[in-house]
């Protein structure tokens, strides 16, 4: 039987560890066994048990303290991940060979690991050799995405990971439970965005015509090919977590030997589900 994996990615502070913790608890309530592997050598703490912890292999602090290497925080993390890529046998021994595994890999947040270095690509290829079906889960903080230019930055980061890793990917806006009513109303348009209208709304903020043309070209590429869409993630809402999990399961065909169901919303009614999600919260006191 195949094994399953989520590669949980996103900028620092986007809620990767919280997502892993919440998803483990949610899957536990569904009688599904899910385990977590920490791949962040700079992680300080997390509130869930881990199947494997890269800090047992190598830590950023140890690398930075090595005077022969003379690395700072970013260089130290890159060194750690390259060292990890040369020691996948350590990960293999930690994972074992149990069939039907479902594992969340909590990854570091430095974007250069996905855009400039092949380390994460090597990891994906190795997991696939071990018969894992891998889905990328790219998280962005919804509190960061309430402005059009910041949203475009988040979209490009998600797109970079998608193009680099060449695996199915679900993009998720986290911390929806922390937004106020006004912010929730603003963020709704970014879940299934019309990139052209977003540019029109901010056209008076461009300081350079070249910058405007570049932004328009990027937005056109994203919009024309429907390359990036986001799902809301509210850890206090079971239905919201179910929708996210169903999309990921569908991407990796989890439980394909059973009668598999499509995600709850089709493209036609996706916006209706988002409307219901925000309407429920608008009615809250």
Swiss-Prot record:
- Sites where the protein binds GTP: 13-18, 174-177
Positions of short motif Gly-Pro-Asn (GPN)-loop: 72-74
InterPro entries in the record: Gpn (IPR004130), Gpn3 (IPR030228), P-loop_NTPase (IPR027417)
Keyword Nucleotide-binding attached: yes
Q: What GO terms are given for molecular function?
A: GTP binding; hydrolase activity
Q: Where is this site: Stabilizes the phosphate intermediate?
A: 74
Pfam families in UniProt: ATP_bind_1 (PF03029)
- What UniProt keywords are attached to this protein's entry? GTP-binding, Hydrolase, Nucleotide-binding
Disordered: annotated span: 261-285
Q: Where does the record place Acidic residues bias?
A: 265-277
**Quaternary structure?**
Heterodimer with gpn1. Binds to RNA polymerase II (RNAPII).
Q: What does this protein do?
A: Small GTPase required for proper localization of RNA polymerase II (RNAPII). May act at an RNAP assembly step prior to nuclear import.
Family under the similarity heading = Belongs to the GPN-loop GTPase family.
Q: What name is this protein filed under?
A: GPN-loop GTPase 3
Species source reads Xenopus tropicalis (Western clawed frog)
């Amino acid at each position: 039987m195949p094994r399953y994996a989520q590669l949980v990615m996103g900028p620092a502070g986007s809620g990767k560890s919280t997502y892993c913790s919440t998803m483990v608890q949610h899957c536990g309530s569904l009688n599904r066994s899910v385990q977590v592997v920490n791949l962040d050598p700079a992680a300080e703490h997390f509130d869930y048990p881990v199947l494997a912890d890269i800090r047992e292999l190598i830590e950023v602090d140890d690398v930075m303290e090595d005077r022969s290497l003379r690395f700072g925080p970013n260089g130290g993390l890159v060194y750690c991940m390259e060292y990890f890529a040369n020691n996948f046998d350590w990960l293999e021994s930690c994972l074992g060979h149990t069939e039907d595994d479902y594992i969340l890999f909590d990854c570091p947040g430095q974007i250069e690991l996905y855009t400039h270095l092949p380390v994460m690509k090597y990891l994906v290829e190795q997991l696939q050799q071990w018969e894992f079906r891998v889905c990328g889960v790219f998280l962005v903080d919804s509190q960061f995405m309430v402005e059009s230019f910041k949203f475009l930055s988040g979209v490009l980061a998600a797109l970079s990971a998608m193009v680099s890793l060449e695996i199915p990917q679900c993009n998720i806006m986290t911390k929806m439970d922390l937004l106020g009513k006004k912010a929730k109303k603003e963020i709704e348009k970014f879940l299934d965005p019309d990139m052209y209208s977003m540019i029109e709304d901010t056209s008076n903020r461009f300081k350079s015509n070249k910058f405007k043309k570049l932004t328009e070209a990027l937005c056109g590429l994203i919009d024309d090919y429907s390359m990036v869409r986001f799902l809301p993630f509210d850890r206090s809402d079971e239905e919201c977590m179910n929708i996210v999990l169903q999309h990921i399961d569908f991407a990796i065909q989890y439980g394909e030997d059973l009668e598999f169901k499509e995600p709850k919303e089709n493209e036609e009614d996706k916006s209706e589900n988002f409307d219901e999600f925000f309407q429920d919260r608008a009615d809250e006191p």
